[in-house]
Amino acid sequence: DITRELVQECLYEHNSGVFILPAPIRPTDWRNVHAGHIERIIGILTQTYDYVILDTPGTFNDIVARALELASMVVLLATVDMASLKDTLLAIDMLRSWNFPQEKIKLVINATNDAHNVQPQEIKRMLGRDVFWSIPYDRNISAATQLGMPVVVSKPTAKASESIVEMAYAISGVR
């Protein structure tokens, strides 16, 4: 049985003050997890925290579907390369086929720079939706990833960090 106490025991507090419920260490540990478990965990977390952010895999299954159903907002992250945009279009089409409320989806483009020459209007035309936010390309992201730290912690003044913080304010409605 999944209890509040069990969920709290499984949380890890990052030194930034954010609580994280890490994924199982071994992929085989997911075999016994089902959508009802995710629903219960999300329910417990939403009673305890103001914001619950789920980093789901890029595949659709019953667990991801249930998490999406429970979400008040879905941030769909893409890059401007054609493979990513194609996958993003497939994800949008899949969600549309599930009658998922399209107003819940916020499209975020990651690692934008002038070299890509893909403008937000072109992305809107390709994907059929506005770009909610664009995070600029920043080499500090790769360095932060190698350190195992969020870029907003390792380099808070980096362009990407500032953009991510502003996006968080825009999403939360705070400020």
Please name every model-derived segment.
Residues D1-I20:
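Phosphate-binding loop that captures ATP/GTP phosphates
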Residues L21, I135:
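Hydrophobic residues at beta-strand termini and immediately following loops
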Residues I25-T28:
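A short, flexible beta-alpha/helix-coil linker loop
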Residues N32, G36-S134, A143:
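Conserved catalytic-core segment of NTP-binding enzymes
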Residues I105, G173-R175:
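Acidic-aromatic/histidine active-site loop/patch
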Residues G128, V165-G173:
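A short, amphipathic alpha-helical segment
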Residues L147-I164:
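C-terminal boundary of histidine-terminating zinc-finger modules
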